[in-house]
Structure formats: structure tokens, C-alpha cells
Amino acid sequence: MPDGTRLAARLWLPVTDHPVPALLEHHPGGLGDTTAVRDAQRHPWYAGHGYASLRVDARGHGSSEGNPADPASPAGTDDGLALLDWLTARPWSNGRAGAFGIGRGGTAALALAARAPEALAAVVAVCADDRTAPRRDLAGAPLAAAVHGGSAARLAAACRPPDPRYTGDDWRRLWLERLAAVDPGADDEGGPIDLRTVRAAVLAFGGWADPQAGTVLRLVEELGPDARGVLGPWPHQYPDQGLPPGPAIGFLQETLRWWDHWLRGADTGVLKEPALRSWMNESVPPAPSYANRPGRWIGDDGWPSPDVREVHYGLDDALRTAGTPSGERFVPVRSPQHTGIDAGALRPAGGAADLPPDQREEDGRSVCFDSVPLPEPEELLGGPALRLRVRCDGRHGQVAARLCDVAPDGSSTLVARGAAALAGGTGPVEVEVELAPVAHAFPAGHRIRLALSSAYWPWLWPVAETGGFEVDPGGSVLTLPVRHLAADAGSGPVTFDPPEHAPVPAELHPEPLVSHPERQVVHDVAAGEWRLQLARPAGATVHPDGLAEEEHVLEAYRIRADDPLGARARTDRTLRLERTDIGWDVTLQLRSEASCDAGHLTVHDHLRALEGGDVIFERHWRRRLPRS
């Protein structure tokens, strides 16, 4: 880099005498371990189709030098510009380049495009974040699982050691410098990405099961005619991985059409595709995982789509709640603190228990407003919106809203959700709650349910008061984005090829000695406490280059049904990396704990780094964060 820092990279080149375009993936995952398999699937495939493909570990991550920096931060984007300049200055380059990535790598590609470098002609962003919404709260309501589990994961990723196979004997010095520089409280990501300055053509992929689905809709809406979006049923994964919920598609073939059009000038028909291609989820019985979600592909020529209209459901008319005296104007909402225990994962990644199970128990802890059985099917595409007239007598409050599909047998499948903070003591006020965007087909005979609760643990930190709030149904309305049932008439089918990948060297996965359920709920009846335990499937991986990796992750959340300030969160992560041929054996241990009081959240992180069983670095961090 211009400051002398060296970044670890791997370059795949096509066998040709002609200049070729280049592709850049700039990501914080280590290319020798964390992303080794998926890198081997796609970068050689792109090279085999005539592209120079470069995979780079972000500064301070993997085997790169320097202090940890998010690749989409201002400093990380500076590195991205330097990498782009290096690529396009190679003698084999035709001067045109594209950038791609998933998650933080996809966000880095968007941030790079916002700098408008001349050589960057196209971007493919998967499950990316345009950073229009804060990462630590949901409409002002502080997130618990996101702040705690997500921050612990980011801290662990930043603390992974360099690999001596690529850095030589310097690995220990680089690791100790990295550990000394890590700050779990730092937020180096930067602000929202300014989409107005993006000149590259953007193809965005996302999944309805991923919290960043809204980014795809915003990119299609704001970037104009050279942007395209694809939203499938997927979790936070590449669309060709086949992880639930599927079905998977030929992501590499689809992106090759994009690269060929913008980097080679070939007529591949990509601009003839609908601006937005979406998977319309069919109604299914609730389950924590679906191998393939039933549904169909649909196409819309723009976003907002002319085929989507707003339909309003008043909470005292089209939707009604049971058990409220007819003379009462306000309906009390006072949920037990463990409401939300069946929320599912905040960011599903294809696990066996990632999705929310049957919502009937959650509905019983909430106030529900139901429609009559639908006389005909109703398909939603976009973000539902909720306007509530509420009264909150406490100092603070929060509302969690869930949209559910209720089958004739009473089973309740979660469709969308959202939340907002409430300011108390001001009398009746109007509150806007944006629910996550969805594509869902309600069948005839099913009911639409809006469930309101005053707690949603562990997604949201509980407020100190337990009084909840009151809602005025007559002043409240749910607005649904309803797509015309005949919108597909006369349109050609939306199709994708099946997945293709480059051949991948074999990894070894020895059977784990101990395993834990991926998601386990325990109710201690005598203590009145609810505990949620999340475990990543344990085990070891031996990578093709001989690196042995073993990681164990256990998250635990607990709360009492009547004690909001007793909420506790804890994550334990252990990572061991070993190269037996050179006698290299290191372990990283991280414990992160979080608690709350009426005005603050307290987070304690404890990190230990070991070499050959001996502790070579240990550090504690304690942060006290105001709830606001």
C-alpha cells in the first residue's frame, strides 16, 4: 500500500496473450482459512472465463500487515483504490475492473464504487449494507444479539493470527501488534454510503432471510437504469451455496453475464432483464429450516414496482383483536420479558435452527390483530409499514411488531417484523414502525395477523419499566405492499442456470467429540428464568494446504419473565490453528459478556492468545454504553 503496509493476496490469471479485465474481492476473512473453499470455487472459475481475479485480505486481517481496518471504512476504501490502481496498471490488464464481495466485502465494493474511480465499471454486491440504518439499533430500540454476538464475532475475526506459511517468522510480531491495536469499542466503518456518487453498474444480490434485503431494493431504486437486483429465499450466503433456505442458482454464470457486458462490451442481455427479480415465497408450515422454500421467480421492471399498491388495514376494522371490552379505546400491551425467545437468528447463515419456529407461543405473549380468512390469495412484495397511536406511561418503552401468516389449523408463520423505541410520559403519540421487506403469498383461507409486544429478547435489550404501552386501534393502521395477482401475465419466465463452481481441493472434517444443539431454549420454572443457547456446529477442518482449524462458539442469553434488568448475554469463542509440519500451534480464547441497567449497557470482553499452550497476550476491555 502507499504507506508501505503489505496486504496478503492471491491472484488467478487466465492463460492468454490478450489484455484482460480484472476483478477485485477485498474482504476481512483470511484467504488461507476462513474463505479458502469459496475462494477456490469462484476465483479460478472467473480466471477460466478470461478474468484476472484478485482476492485480498483486508488490512490487519488474515495474513495482511497493519492494524485491523474494515475494508469499507475510509481507510479500507483507500486501500481498495490502491489495489484497483495496481490491478489496472499490470501489463496484462485492459484497464477495466469490477469489484465484488459478500457481507462486509460487498459493502466494501459499494464503498469503493462511491469514490467513483474511473477504472471501476461494474460491481456485484451480495448481502451488502448501504449503511442507511444504524448497526446497533432497530429504529432506536437497542439491539442485543446484534451488538453482543456480532461484536464478539468481529472482535474474534480481527484477532485471528497471520499464517506463518505466508508471513514467515514475522507472524508473531504481526499478531502481537494486531492484538495490541484491537479496540472492540471502535466503530471504523464510516457513515452511510453516498449512492449519488456511484458511477459503476451495480448488480445486487440478497436473500429474504437476510437482514440486508432492503439494501437491494434501495440500490435498484436509487442507482437508475444500470442497476439490477436479485432477491432469493436465501440466508446470509452466496446464492450458489445451496444452504437453506434454497433453491440455489448459478451465481457465477449470472455475474459473468454482468462482467462480460460492462467490462468487455459483450451483448449478454443483462439490461433486458427486469430491474428486480424476486423469489415469491409460498405459504408453508412454520419450521426452523427449509432445504428449499416453495415459491416462484417473478420480475418487476422497476422499484418501486408499478404492480405493487398499498392496501391499508385498520386495527379497528380490517384487523381486530379479541378480548377487548367494547367501551375501551386503548388496548394494553404488556409482554413478558422473554417474548422473542422464538425469534430465530438475527442473521441466518443456513443453520438447522436459524429460522423462527411456530409463532403461536409468541403470539400468546403479544396482542394480536387478525383479519378474516382471506377470500382470495394476497401477495406481498416490499416493506410493510405500521402507524400506531400509542400511550406509554413509563419513561421509555419499545414496540415489536410481527406480521404472521395464520393457517386454518392455527399455526403461525412469521413473515416480517420491525421495532421502534417509544418516548414515555407525553400522552398519545403516533409512531411509525417499518417492517423488513418481504415477498410472501398468503393463500385464500389464511388470516393476516399483526402481533404487537412490548419486549423482544434477545433481539432487543429490554427497557427498565415493565408497564408496556397502550395502543389505540382506531388511530392505527397496517399498510401492506400488495402485488397484483396478474402482474406476471404476458411476461416471460424468470430463470437461472444451476450452480457451477471450479473444482475445489478436498477438506477434511473429522467427527466432533462433543456437539451441542444449534438452538436450545430452557425454562427454569422455579426460578422463572428463560435461557437461550446458540451453538455453532463444533468440529475441526483440515484445509487443503495442511492448516488444521478448530473453532467452538457458544452464545447464551438469559432473562426472567418479570425482570428486564436481569437480562444477560455471554459469548465464548475458542479458535485453535495448527501446522504440524512446522510445529505451529496457536489458540485464541474470547469471552464477551453484556448486561444492562436503567440507563446503560455494560460490555466486558476478555481475550487470551496462546502459543503452544502458553499465554503470550491477555487483555480485558470494559465499556459502559448509554442506551441512547
Residue ranges and their predicted role:
Residues R173-A227, L231:
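Serine-hydrolase catalytic core
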Residues V230, Y238-P239, P244-L610, D614-S628:
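C-terminal, loop-rich substrate-recognition/catalytic regions characterized by aromatic stacking residues
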Residues W92-G103:
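Alpha/beta-hydrolase fold nucleophile elbow
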Residues D39-A40, G48, A114-A116, L120-T197:
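Accessory cap/linker subdomain of secreted extracellular hydrolases
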Residues M1-D17, D370, L374-E376:
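N-terminal cap/lid segment of alpha/beta-hydrolase-fold proteins
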Residues V15-T88, L138, R395-A401, A407-D409, ...:
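Cap/lid segment of the alpha/beta-hydrolase catalytic domain
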